[in-house]
């Protein structure tokens, strides 16, 4: 008799434990279900928080009771020691120290801020202004009071740092003086600027019409159309992705071949030769980057003809390119790699097997070009 009672009590306790485990696993429908389970028509175990809200990290709450959050990270944001704003504000790097100072620093013209820490949805809205950096990398824009000054200075700095040593088209001091004068001038007597802007707008509109009309088969090819496509190629090469500029350059080369600009007998195509009688350009120095740029153009112009001896001719061209080892400008190094690719492409299209020396020179040029790319990327400069 005692054994039967003991076994009965053991069976009852085991049944209760199994029932409780099933309730925790599947949940039971109670009359006092939480708001989340009632709205989603789920089984609720009546706990606070319930099993369903724990599983999916909902804010479990019952009617007439306080809300219970199920996120384990929520307590971090309620802690008094969790402060964002003053610490992060102190870590900012000022981009411009003085808006009236037109002289740039010697170390660097622009200092980008550190990475923006992740902002959680539980953070208070009043600290949002303290979390926002001066520069937002994902949107590529500035959004503070000195935006109109700093953003153009980036491109001015890139131009005079990389492009100006090669081409030397502008006077940096005169340009900075003129920009500062126009910036400080508060008068409205700027009729000359208005005229220039209107003329530029009409010119852009005309070029757009010419480029759009070039898609039609009824439009005859002309030098004007070729010039428009060349300008479009230069613009796309400086502003957009490489494949778009490559398409534009291919179209411009096709138009140049149709018009016959690549032939010496251009008179047969309705054009005439142009004599440059007003050349005032001075001779470039042999030690400067401009002279190295001239040498690159000479190599391109001298080694364009494919003949039976092209294998030895192109070997001489690659050897001349290999001798240009004193190039220090990253932009010129990339141009040198472009010239090597162009010459090697001509050999490939002509089905001429290159010498091993040509391949080794090409690989060495590629290595230097990759180093220049890494250098420009580390300096955040476009090329």
Curated annotation (Swiss-Prot):
PANTHER family: 2-NITROPROPANE DIOXYGENASE FAMILY, PUTATIVE (AFU_ORTHOLOGUE AFUA_2G17430)-RELATED (PTHR31779), SNOAL-LIKE DOMAIN-CONTAINING PROTEIN (PTHR31779:SF6). It is found in: Nucleus. InterPro entries: Metabolite_Synth_Reg, Zn2-C6_fun-type_DNA-bd_sf, Zn2Cys6_DnaBD. Keywords: DNA-binding, Metal-binding, Nucleus, Transcription, Transcription regulation, Zinc. This is Probable transcriptional repressor C1348.12. PROSITE patterns: ZN2_CY6_FUNGAL_1, ZN2_CY6_FUNGAL_2. Residues 34-60 bind DNA. GO terms for biological process: positive regulation of transcription by RNA polymerase II. Transmembrane segments: none annotated. GO terms for cellular component: nucleus. The keyword Plastid does not apply. Gene3D superfamilies: Zn(2)-C6 fungal-type DNA-binding domain. The lineage of its organism: Eukaryota, Fungi, Dikarya, Ascomycota, Taphrinomycotina. One of its GO terms (molecular function) is DNA-binding transcription factor activity, RNA polymerase II-specific. Probable transcriptional repressor of multidrug resistance genes. Its main location: nucleus. SMART domains: GAL4 (SM00066). The keyword Zinc applies.
